Amino acid sequence: MSALTFDKSELGNLEYSLQREMLATDRIGGYMSTTIVCCNTRRYHGLMVAPIDDSDRTYVLLSALDETIIQHDQTFNLALHRFQGTYEPRGHKYITDFEYTPTPTITYRVGGVILKKEMLWIHKRTQLMIRYTLVDAHSETRLRLRPFPVSYTHLRAHETKA
């Protein structure tokens, strides 16, 4: 199977990258959906979206997970959020490549730090695994994670019989 890949020039161009989306499912109604730069641009986007009852609704349980690299008492926020037409923080500038083979993988570079993030939905279970690999760092490096849980819902699409 061939990989779906995007490079730094494509990822750094928000007009381009915000139009490219990724989707991974657990095959029982849950999914992860966002853009290739991890900026949620649609109401149904999120890292963990799942039905939690027998209703016709899915719930965005985890909207985003913001990562911050800390090195030499300096912080580098890797996140990208859209607020009323503006984008902050602009962490997409640290993304060097995106690859979907079959797991969405994003590589960040901040100075001498190279960090790889892999996102995997577990089939038949509503579980998301995110693995971070510190590929290279020239000095002590810490990673801070901040989850953005939310609890809004939307109706699931239905199949209608003719």
Language-model-derived ranges and their functions:
Residues L120-I122, V135:
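Short beta-strand micro-motifs enriched in acidic
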Residues T107-L120:
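Low-complexity, acidic Ser/Thr/Pro/Gly-rich terminal tails and inter-domain linkers that flank the onset
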Residues L143-P149:
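Surface-exposed beta-strand/loop patches in extracellular or lumenal glycoproteins
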Residues P104, T141-L143:
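Short beta-strand/loop motifs in extracellular/secreted proteins, especially
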Residues T153-T160:
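Conserved small/polar residues in nucleotide/adenosyl-binding loops
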Residues L128-D136:
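Short, well-ordered beta-strand segments enriched in hydrophobic/aromatic residues
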Residues E10, L14-P104:
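An extended acidic
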